[in-house]
Amino acid sequence: MLSPKRTRFRKQHRGRMKGISHRGNQICFGRYALQALEPAWITSRQIEAGRRAMSRNVRRGGQIWVRIFPDKPVTVRPTETRMGSGKGSPEYWVAVVKPGKIVYEMGGVAENIARKAISIAASKMPIRTQFIISG
């Protein structure tokens, strides 16, 4: 699972996901990519599940790049706990993804293989996505 080695602060505010992604919205490394179409928090488990599904599909020869990193801690309070007494402890990490953000990139394979692998990875994501080709 992906997570930061160390952070400056243990806990973060939830924040708001306004607007579109202005950075990380171009294909940089591969030829094919999976682009987010709606805003969401994507957990490190979801990122890893998508990566595994893609790598299992392309086997050798293909290269995969994960363009998002879960750097935001999400805190969860223990069950059956009364209100108050501080914020919960960090449970898992999420990547904040806005519309337009490239999630995965792929290269070194034929388009039909890439399309199949990326569609399997897209089914693991909690958002609508699209397959794009660098032109």
Swiss-Prot record:
Primary location group: plastid
Family matches, as InterPro entries: Ribosomal_uL16, Ribosomal_uL16_bact-type, Ribosomal_uL16_CS, Ribosomal_uL16_dom, Ribosomal_uL16_sf
Alphabetical keyword list: Chloroplast, Plastid, Ribonucleoprotein, Ribosomal protein
Any matching Pfam family: Ribosomal_L16
Domain of life (superkingdom): Eukaryota
Gene3D superfamilies in the record: Ribosomal protein L10e/L16
GO cellular component assignments: chloroplast; mitochondrial large ribosomal subunit
CDD domains recorded: Ribosomal_L16_L10e
SUPFAM superfamilies to which the protein is assigned, alphabetical: Ribosomal protein L16p/L10e
Cited PROSITE patterns: RIBOSOMAL_L16_1, RIBOSOMAL_L16_2
Subcellular location: Plastid, Chloroplast
GO biological process, alphabetically ordered: mitochondrial translation
UniProt GO molecular function: rRNA binding; structural constituent of ribosome
Subunit annotation: Part of the 50S ribosomal subunit.
Family affiliation: Belongs to the universal ribosomal protein uL16 family.
PANTHER family: 50S/60S RIBOSOMAL PROTEIN L16, LARGE RIBOSOMAL SUBUNIT PROTEIN UL16M
NCBIfam families listed in its UniProt record: rplP_bact (TIGR01164)
The protein's name in its UniProt record: Large ribosomal subunit protein uL16c
Organism listed in the record: Lotus japonicus (Lotus corniculatus var. japonicus)
